[in-house]
């Protein structure tokens, strides 16, 4: 819902304060309880994964018993421990976003011109001002530039200025987290984030020519992109008729920002494949993408594409609106999009709508530290100081972020009885159906749980809502922190299966 009046917000805030007070009492009760034994099937799968039970922290509790936060869980195992939730941290960011911004919130990208238009020529500069839109993908950038042309502009005598000043400049090196700089999940937030700073390559075999053609999206100006690659029937080390590790067989060469190429071959058995990579020079990506697309649609530019600020005296000729926050959090949670989560996280300190609801002022430019403080203040106002999350970038792509399963369960219970419950639950993967849980092997809980997943090299996690056949709904939070954590995913799915069965009793 959107809160249009001060009175509506105060009523809503009072209700949440009461929920927080109830939750605080629940916390004390849960903390005093002895740990509940883990189900036998979960224990067996943990042993198979060589993960000790001490590496597990979990809680299963009713989502809304009588519309109140429940004090007595069905299962509580080390639920007060602070653990790394991996991408399950996105639940905190997206629920905070729904509460502070509202489900219908949109990001606007203003476009300015600073000169007259004569005979199809803009005699001045075009300015595109980024305001943190998490989903300014190529299709929407194309529409934005077509709107520029609809103003009668076919040529620009000056420059195209890209204003990225709404966010503090990132000092993040794409390879810092795990040494994988070309993985799109490592892209840093940007006020003018275009197409996730990624290049999408589509490989299409043409057996007649012995080549696989390569289509690149977007067209990056002044970057050579290899048009085709030789095909191989049986690459070395690959069984006949199998695709194998086709990415490695291509022998990619991504380090040069002026060239994307391959020195290997493409297996015939692979058919058509798509590969997305993060561009080697993220600082120049936006300039290259805008120029490449402007030229592709027939636009001419007398100057160049460069960074610059929109003059304060100018008014935009139009603003390009993003999809709603409801749509954005579906991408964040169902597909665990890290950079979109970080864009939302940064927005929370930049938006006057969000900060005003906490009695604070917006920060310019937005920064990670300012956003951490916004989310901490939001948590304190909703839930008190208990189980206060340790925040980094809000996406879970971090070695430092921490939550307690107990605190996360309380948040999910509160969300369940809130006006934004449909939007939050609808953003979560449905086990065995879609998103990051589409390929779940669970047969008991398939279609019966909405869960956010998280995986790092030493953490695996699930959290969300489980539904039983008799209509009972449970909150499940389960997190494993261990070097073998990824192998413990079946154990977490077994806990979800157990919750489905227990909920039906």
Region locations from a protein language model:
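Small-residue-rich helix-loop
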Residues: 69-76, 335, 345-505
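Bacterial N-terminal signal peptides that target proteins for export
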Residues: 2-17
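Conserved serine DD-peptidase/penicillin-binding transpeptidase domain
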Residues: 33-49, 99-386, 494, 501-505
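Short active-site loop at a secondary-structure junction
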Residues: 76-96
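Beta-lactamase-like hydrolase cores
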Residues: 31-67, 75-82, 147-150
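A short glycine/serine-rich beta->alpha loop
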Residues: 77-83, 276-277, 395-398
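N-terminal signal peptide c-region/cleavage motif recognized by signal peptidases
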Residues: 21, 26-27
């Amino acid at each position: 819902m959107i809160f249009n009046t001060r009175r509506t917000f105060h009523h809503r805030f009072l209700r949440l304060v009461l929920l927080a007070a109830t939750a605080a009492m629940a916390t004390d009760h849960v903390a005093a309880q002895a740990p509940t034994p883990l189900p036998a099937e979960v224990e067996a799968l943990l042993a198979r994964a060589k993960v000790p039970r001490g590496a597990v922290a979990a809680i299963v509790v009713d989502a809304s018993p009588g519309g109140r936060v429940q004090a007595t869980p069905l299962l509580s195992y080390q639920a007060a421990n602070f653990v790394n939730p991996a991408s399950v941290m996105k639940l905190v960011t997206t629920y905070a976003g729904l509460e502070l911004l509202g489900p219908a919130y949109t990001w606007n990208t203003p476009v300015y011109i600073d000169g007259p238009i004569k005979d199809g020529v803009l005699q001045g500069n075009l300015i595109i001002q980024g305001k943190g839109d998490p989903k300014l993908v190529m299709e929407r950038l194309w529409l934005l530039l077509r709107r520029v042309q609809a103003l009668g502009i076919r040529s620009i005598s000056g420059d195209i200025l890209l204003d990225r000043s709404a966010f503090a400049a990132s000092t993040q090196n794409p390879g810092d987290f795990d040494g994988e700089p070309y993985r799109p999940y490592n892209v840093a937030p940007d006020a003018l984030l275009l197409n996730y700073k990624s290049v999408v390559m589509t490989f299409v075999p043409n057996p007649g020519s012995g080549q696989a053609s390569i289509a690149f999206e977007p067209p990056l100006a002044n970057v050579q992109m290899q048009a085709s690659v030789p095909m191989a029937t049986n690459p070395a080390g690959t069984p006949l008729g199998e695709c194998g590790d086709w990415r490695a067989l291509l022998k990619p060469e991504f380090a040069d920002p002026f060239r994307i190429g391959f020195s290997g071959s493409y297996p015939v058995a692979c058919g058509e494949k798509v590969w997305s990579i993060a561009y080697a020079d993220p600082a120049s990506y936006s300039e290259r993408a805008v120029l490449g697309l402007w030229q592709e649609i027939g636009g001419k530019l007398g100057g160049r594409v460069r960074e610059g600020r929109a003059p304060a005296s100018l008014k935009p000729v139009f603003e390009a609106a993003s999809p709603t926050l409801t749509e954005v959090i579906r991408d964040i949670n169902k597909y665990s999009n890290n950079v979109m989560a970080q864009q939302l996280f940064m927005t929370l300190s930049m938006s006057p709508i969000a900060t005003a609801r906490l009695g604070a002022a917006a920060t310019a430019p937005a920064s990670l530290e300012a956003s951490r403080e916004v989310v901490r203040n939001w948590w304190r106002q909703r839930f008190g100081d208990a189980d206060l999350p340790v925040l980094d970038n809000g996406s879970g792509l971090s070695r430092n972020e921490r939550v307690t399963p107990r605190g996360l369960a309380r948040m999910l219970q509160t969300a369940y009885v809130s006006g934004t419950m449909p939007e939050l639950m609808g953003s979560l993967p449905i086990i065995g159906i879609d998103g990051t849980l589409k390929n779940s092997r669970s047969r008991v809980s398939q279609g019966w749980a909405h869960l956010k997943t998280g995986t790092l090299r030493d953490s695996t996690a699930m959290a969300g809502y489980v539904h039983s056949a008799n209509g009972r709904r449970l909150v499940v939070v389960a997190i494993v922190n261990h070097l073998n954590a990824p192998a413990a995913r079946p154990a977490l799915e077994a806990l979800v299966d157990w919750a489905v069965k227990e909920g039906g009793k």
